[in-house]
Amino acid sequence: MNQTEWIIPCNPQSYNLQAALTNSDEVYWRQNARYEIGDIIYIYLSKGVSAIRYKAIVIRTDIEIKSEDDPYWIDKTMQSQKLQKVLLKRIKTFNTALLSYDLLKENGLKSTIQGPIKLKGSLRDYVNRIDQNQ
């Protein structure tokens, strides 16, 4: 199996991921790309943070679960969506400015992070280097 690395966005004004990961290392996430079990997911917190804060691994895919059961939604309109989910398990929490949007952009990020992005080339090399040194 070929492992893919992704950056995915999380808007902390819509979903309280920090609280969710305080209570458990596992979180259900919208399956809006072709994630496979074993893929690595770097979670980028947008508004107010603008940096990668978490590294997770996909442990299950194609899950049907009601978002209403998730108490960490701030934006209740998003909570009501019925979407396929994946189960992510947190591997690491980052507390470094080295994974900020500006430095990601300087190291190969070509666009804003509004959806899943496959890590490739110089951006992948940069994120992996910071990850290994944290």
Predicted features, each with a name:
Residues 1-8, 14-20, 24-30, 66-134:
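Contiguous surface segments at macromolecular interaction interfaces
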Residues 12, 47, 60-62, 92:
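Short, flexible loop/turn elements at secondary-structure junctions
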Residues 32-45:
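Short coil-to-beta transition motif at edge beta-strands of beta-rich domains
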Residues 37-39, 54, 84:
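Short beta-strand or tight-loop elements
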Residues 45-51:
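Short, charged beta-turn/beta-strand-edge "cap" motif at the junction between a beta-strand
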Residues 52-61:
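Short beta-strand-centered aromatic/proline hotspots
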